[in-house]
């Protein structure tokens, strides 16, 4: 039996569905003959094995890298570590108990495993969603409200939030071990098989439950993340625009100074006020002016590097969010659809559509490590450093790569449009 399918199939109306001829890959009608497709088991085994291996390898590698490299244990990476653990849990505890019963056409692992697998799957999805919401809010605070967020943007606070998300998720998903049970059915050879099904007492409870999950795991988190990342994108755009204006103004002032002599006015940010000094004073202040210009160039370069690092992190997190919803929204939408209109849902989703939806839901467990590897340099360095056989690419804890290493200091504040100019000149880069 397909364990993810236990979220989609509640076990009700099995007989009526078979009588109507809605045969599919979800074991609605195992007691009814249907054409055999010899290539389907091979393709199913291949795809599930590929996703399983990628998920186990990728998430284990992410966990290992973050544990071994202390300088990578930033606030955001702590949430990503929790995300990797939940994905690994989904893979290990659910996929084998999904594929094997699907191939054998019988859930052979017993009632306890049926309850455990559905419970862990629901919990892992909930933890992943709550972690993504926490990451988006943490990023919003670090970039848009750097000074106000310094109080709570700490590793200890992140650990408390993660502990709360896990406890909340385990609490919310308690109906799964309570109402998941084995449902017997008669096979074609007149032997009795079992299906693992999530059975609520009545249709009203079924509809309420799936609507509740759709709200707390997708609609509300989706709105929160879209607003947070939208405000972050706006803040980054304003910072880039403000920096471009300042650089253009500085270049114009430099050109004007070179052509018409020293200027009397300055904006107080990037250029120091200058006078008409005597030759002796100019000669004495030349080294100091050169040092000041060098510091300003370092500040400008540091601000640009920090800004680009933050943009890379935001792109990575946005892709994670989009792919997560792309993978899980179909199955939860299908759950809600079937809860309100069982016959129509089974008619349209039976066969290939539901098979694709179920496989897509498991793909979420392997995409996050791929995103880390391709979109973040520090993770790539950490991946290579994990293996002794690989050449040492250097310490993966180089500052500025992830953009969170300096949270709460000048880096986080420098991305605010108004602190962008003042914080960058208040002190040299640490």
From Swiss-Prot:
The UniProt record lists the keyword Glycoprotein: yes
Region (Disordered): 396-430
Disulfide bond entries: 18-29, 114-196
InterPro entries in alphabetical order: Cholcskin_rcpt, Cholcy_rcpt_A, CholecystokininA_recpt_N, CholecystokininA_recpt_N_sf, GPCR_Rhodpsn, GPCR_Rhodpsn_7TM
Membrane topology, as annotated: Multi-pass membrane protein
One Gene Ontology term, aspect cellular component: plasma membrane
UniProt KW keywords: Cell membrane, Disulfide bond, G-protein coupled receptor, Glycoprotein, Lipoprotein, Membrane, Palmitate, Receptor, Transducer, Transmembrane, Transmembrane helix
Glycosylation sites: 10, 13, 24, 190
Lipid-carrying residues in chain (S-palmitoyl cysteine): 389
Extracellular side: 1-41, 105-115, 179-210, 337-351
Family label: Belongs to the G-protein coupled receptor 1 family.
Name the UniProt record assigns to this protein: Cholecystokinin receptor type A
Name of the gene encoding the protein in the UniProt record: CCKAR
